[in-house]
Amino acid sequence: MRDPVFLLGFWSLYCCFPAGSLTTLRPQGSLRDEHHKPTGVPVTITTKPSVTFNIRTSKDPEHEGCNLSLGDSKLLENCGFNMTAKTFFIIHGWTMSGMFESWLHKLVSALQTREKEANVVVVDWLPLAHQLYIDAVSNTRVVGRRVAGMLNWLQEKGEFSLGDVHLIGYSLGAHVAGYAGNFVKGTVGRITGLDPAGPMFEGVDINRRLSPDDADFVDVLHTYTLSFGLSIGIRMPVGHIDIYPNGGDFQPGCGFNDVMGSFAYGTISEMVKCEHERAVHLFVDSLVNQDKPSFAFQCTDPNRFKRGICLSCRKNRCNNIGYNAKKMRKKRNSKMYLKTRAGMPFRVYHYQLKVHMFSYKNSGDIQPDLYITLYGSNADSQNLPLEIVEKIELNATNTFLVYTEEYLGDLFKIRLTWEGVSSSWYNLWNEFRSYLSQPSSPSRELHIRRIRVKSGETQRKVAFCVQDPMKNSISPGQELWFYKCQNDCRVKN
């Protein structure tokens, strides 16, 4: 994926085949039909696929580790495999370089640091992944069967438990993990899908992709689900919980604001790599920054989350992300969302704002440019924009989502600012228009008496009242100050 033609490789799936032909290029054969062979797809699979299981015994990325061999119990002992410990299998994805990427060594090191007694095994299927994408997709099923074979052999040792197995798959590797979980005799404890690949997996049968049936607990991070009409990561939910950081598309720090520049200078592949690989770094972050866990919140769609509607933790509606995710098994997939920083630690602090706006005059279809500053006992926020996902409803309560990169502590006051031309100049312009017998523009004045704030991380709710009840109006170029309401500091909203 370091190669500059990474994105072009995906685009070739769409530009080089007739419309609709991709449906015939999906992974062939049911997982439960062991003897079915793909037809109509060029597959470069040898009789004995090149898949190795390398147990990492050192944090040094230059250390080669020790290769396990199915059926060789003596080698298992010599490699220091602990039959009663947790066992992690890390499964990489498609590769254009034929080499491991730097993220793999970081993930190995983070797991070894967090779980010192655990077995960390790298599933090396580079010879089968270093192919045309459509061939690598076909090979995922074969690799999944090899992983299942290794797990079945380990189970024969008696002390080894599938419940202690955690398969971690990135991109195509996530679907390899799904195949392994489906083929194995018994149920794997957990599978984590790190931005599972989308092309040729989107919308297919559950037996041909990662699904909740593949392990006792399947959690998924989606970080690159949509870009220019092509989703490199899978959009659809495929686990018990599916987490979409920043909506699951453009990730902070990955060059979204300079997309055209990326095209111009040939660095689009780096932007793609950043977005797609962000899932891995979020997982690593959850291992190394235990004191700064990131929380995700259940929501039906990203727009509702952007509006700040979904910050409830009742009935398991919020969860940690990454390694610390709590097991949730429901009949339906739980889609969850959160905001993040551009780098480690990725944690931010979410706030829901409920603002009742009303007007004594006809304000028409008004879209104010509002900013808010939160003042806390630990720190003050920056001037935060209130994103208007849908139009402002007058004489009604409007909900917003804001987030900060640092912990503010207990909030004690709020400043609300309406950016733009001051009201005096606006009124002067209206009078001039009236003099010329032109219809007046709608009044640009809002009245706000109270703001209710809820912290997503602490679930605490506080009400803030305008400083002077008689001065609750705000127009462009003005600001309003709010302080904790004397009689209603803690609210139920």
From Swiss-Prot:
Disulfide bond entries: C66-C79, C254-C274, C299-C318, C310-C313, C465-C485
Catalytic activity reported: a triacylglycerol + H2O = a diacylglycerol + a fatty acid + H(+); a 1,2-diacyl-sn-glycero-3-phosphocholine + H2O = a 2-acyl-sn-glycero-3-phosphocholine + a fatty acid + H(+); 1,2,3-tri-(9Z-octadecenoyl)-glycerol + H2O = di-(9Z)-octadecenoylglycerol + (9Z)-octadecenoate + H(+); 1,2,3-tributanoylglycerol + H2O = dibutanoylglycerol + butanoate + H(+)
GO molecular function list: heparin binding; lipoprotein lipase activity; phospholipase A1 activity; phospholipase activity; triacylglycerol lipase activity
Active-site residues per Swiss-Prot or TrEMBL entry: S171 (nucleophile), D195 (charge relay system), H276 (charge relay system)
Main location: secreted
Signal peptide, first to last residue: 1-23
EC annotation from Swiss-Prot or TrEMBL: 3.1.1.3, 3.1.1.32
Localization of this protein: Secreted
CDD domains cross-referenced by the UniProt entry: Pancreat_lipase_like, PLAT_LPL
Residues the record marks as carrying a glycan: N67, N82, N395
Keywords of this entry: Disulfide bond, Glycoprotein, Heparin-binding, Hydrolase, Lipid degradation, Lipid metabolism, Secreted, Signal
GO biological process, one term: phospholipid homeostasis
Misc: It is termed endothelial lipase due to the fact that it is synthesized in endothelial cells, a characteristic that distinguishes it from other members of the family. However, this protein is also expressed in other cell types.
Entry's family note: Belongs to the AB hydrolase superfamily. Lipase family.
Protein name as annotated: Endothelial lipase
